[in-house]
Regions:
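Phosphate/oxyanion-binding loops and surfaces in catalytic or ligand/nucleic-acid-binding neighborhoods
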Residues: 16, 20, 114, 147
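Conserved beta-loop-beta/alpha segment of the NTase-like Rossmann-fold superfamily
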Residues: 1-51, 80, 88-89
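PAPS-dependent sulfotransferase catalytic core
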Residues: 130
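Catalytic-core segments of class I nucleotidyltransferases/pyrophosphorylases
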Residues: 55-126, 135-138, 142-146
């Protein structure tokens, strides 16, 4: 889904996760807008934080309110979980959302409800671009092609 993520970013995610010994470390992206090649980020989940910057949840855009859809910090779904925590909690996922799907992002809510820590790393916007359609593939290719 995120073909432009670099090995350096994955290493940073893993290193941060191991250093901080948290249940979850995740990448986040702050987009300046949802125009041009950044339009695909509009479909990404929004990061909801409290006044102190602590993550409260990541809400899928399909389930977000109009106000929440204005949030420009998005979730590219790049995670590093504590393995033992993950295996103990996967079966707790529910599909009680508009789509009737199981959302991996619901694990964030479980981490929060269990008062476990979440660490985030901000990554380069271009690395986080998702490719699920022909248009998104063209956008990703345009980011790789140097302009003359």
């Amino acid at each position: 889904d995120n073909p432009l993520v670099t090995p350096k970013t994955i290493q940073k995610l893993a290193k941060t996760h191991l250093k901080d010994a948290v249940a979850l470390t995740m990448a986040v992206v702050k987009v300046s807008n949802f125009n041009d090649w950044r339009r695909s980020f509009y479909s990404f989940g929004r990061i909801i934080r409290d006044s102190k910057g602590k993550i409260l949840k990541s809400i899928e855009v399909k389930d977000a309110t109009l106000e929440q859809r204005k949030i420009r910090e998005v979730n590219p779904s790049i995670y590093c979980f504590n393995a033992s925590w993950l295996w103990k909690n996967l079966e707790k996922l529910k599909n009680t959302n508009i789509q009737g799907e199981f959302y991996l992002t619901d694990l964030l809510e479980l981490v929060i409800n269990q008062k476990k820590s979440i660490e985030t790393i901000r990554i380069n916007t271009k690395e986080a671009i998702g490719v699920n359609t022909e248009d998104q593939l063209a956008d990703a290719e345009s980011l790789l092609t140097p302009t003359l």
